[in-house]
C-alpha cells in the first residue's frame, strides 16, 4: 500500500472544503473519451461539480442514484443506463467509514445497492472522503442494509442474532422501492465474513459493507492536504 500527500498550504479547511478538495482531486483519474461511474452523497456531489468542467471530454457517466443523475444532467453530462455499458474504467464515490484495508461502510444516502453494482463493474474504485471517515474497525457508523419491505421484521431478527441493533430508517424508500435497516452496535472485525453473512439472509437486497470489493485508491482530505492511498 502506497501513501502520498498533496499539500494545500497553511489554510484551515472546513469539512465541506475537505470534501471539495478530494472531489476535485479525483479528476486526475478521469480519462478523456470514457464513461465515468459516479456515486452518491455530499462528497460525490463535489466530484460531479468537478466532472462538469470535463463534460466536453468524456462520453458521459453512469449514476448510482436518481439524485446524482439529476445533478449530472443539470451540468450537461449524458447519463448512460448501466445496461448500455460493457465496462467502466473508474467509479468515484464517498464512504461513511473506510479502514486500513480499503474496506468501507457505505449507504448513509440509501443508494448502497446501485453503488455496489456499479463498483463491481468498474476496473478501479476511487474512494473520496475526509479524514473523519478513516477508522481502525468498521461499525461505529450504523451499517445500512437494504431490505425488501415485507421481510423487514424477519431480517431484523436475524441481524440481532449477528450482534447488531437494527433500526428501521423511517420515511426512507430507496430508488429501488425498498427500505433501510440501520444496524447499530456492530464491531466488524471480519468485514468479508459479515458482508457474506448478511447478504445470505433472505429478504436482504444488499448490505452497505464494501469488503469483498473495496477501494483501489482512497483520496483522503486532511488538514495537511489530500492524502492518496493506493492499495
Swiss-Prot record:
The keyword Plastid does not apply. GO terms for molecular function: ribose-5-phosphate isomerase activity. Pathway: Carbohydrate degradation; pentose phosphate pathway; D-ribose 5-phosphate from D-ribulose 5-phosphate (non-oxidative stage): step 1/1. It is an enzyme of class 5 (isomerase). Keywords: Isomerase. It catalyses: aldehydo-D-ribose 5-phosphate = D-ribulose 5-phosphate. Substrate binds at residues 40-43, 93-96, 106-109, 133. Its EC number is 5.3.1.6. It comes from the Bacteria. Transmembrane segments: none annotated. GO terms for biological process: D-ribose metabolic process; pentose-phosphate shunt, non-oxidative branch. GO terms for cellular component: cytosol. The active site is at 115 (proton acceptor). InterPro entries: NagB/RpiA_transferase-like, Ribose5P_isomerase_typA_subgr, Ribose5P_isomerase_type_A. It holds the Pfam family Rib_5-P_isom_A. Catalyzes the reversible conversion of ribose-5-phosphate to ribulose 5-phosphate. Belongs to the ribose 5-phosphate isomerase family. Homodimer. This is Ribose-5-phosphate isomerase A. It comes from Escherichia coli O1:K1 / APEC. The lineage of its organism: Bacteria, Pseudomonadati, Pseudomonadota, Gammaproteobacteria, Enterobacterales.
Amino acid at each position: 500500500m502506497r501513501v502520498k500527500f498533496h499539500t494545500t498550504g497553511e489554510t484551515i479547511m472546513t469539512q465541506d472544503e475537505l470534501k471539495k478538495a478530494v472531489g476535485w482531486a479525483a479528476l486526475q483519474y478521469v480519462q478523456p473519451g470514457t464513461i465515468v461511474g459516479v456515486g452518491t452523497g455530499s462528497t460525490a456531489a463535489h466530484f460531479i461539480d468537478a466532472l462538469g468542467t470535463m463534460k466536453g471530454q468524456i462520453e458521459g457517466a453512469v449514476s448510482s442514484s436518481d439524485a446524482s443523475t439529476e445533478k449530472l444532467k443539470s451540468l450537461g453530462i449524458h447519463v448512460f443506463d448501466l445496461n448500455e455499458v460493457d465496462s467502466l474504467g473508474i467509479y468515484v464515490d464517498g464512504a461513511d467509514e473506510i479502514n486500513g484495508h480499503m474496506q468501507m461502510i457505505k449507504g448513509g444516502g440509501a443508494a448502497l445497492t446501485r453503488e455496489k453494482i456499479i463498483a463491481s463493474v468498474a476496473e478501479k474504485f476511487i474512494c473520496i472522503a475526509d479524514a473523519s471517515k478513516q477508522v481502525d474497525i468498521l461499525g461505529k457508523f450504523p451499517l445500512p442494509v437494504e431490505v425488501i419491505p415485507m421481510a423487514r421484521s424477519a431480517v431484523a431478527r436475524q441481524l440481532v442474532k449477528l450482534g447488531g441493533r437494527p433500526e428501521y430508517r423511517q420515511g426512507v424508500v430507496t430508488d429501488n422501492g425498498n427500505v433501510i435497516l440501520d444496524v447499530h452496535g456492530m464491531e466488524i472485525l471480519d468485514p468479508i465474513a459479515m458482508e457474506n453473512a448478511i447478504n445470505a439472509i433472505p429478504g436482504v437486497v444488499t448490505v452497505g459493507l464494501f469488503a469483498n470489493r473495496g477501494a483501489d485508491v482512497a483520496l483522503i482530505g486532511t488538514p495537511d492536504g489530500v492524502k492518496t492511498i493506493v492499495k
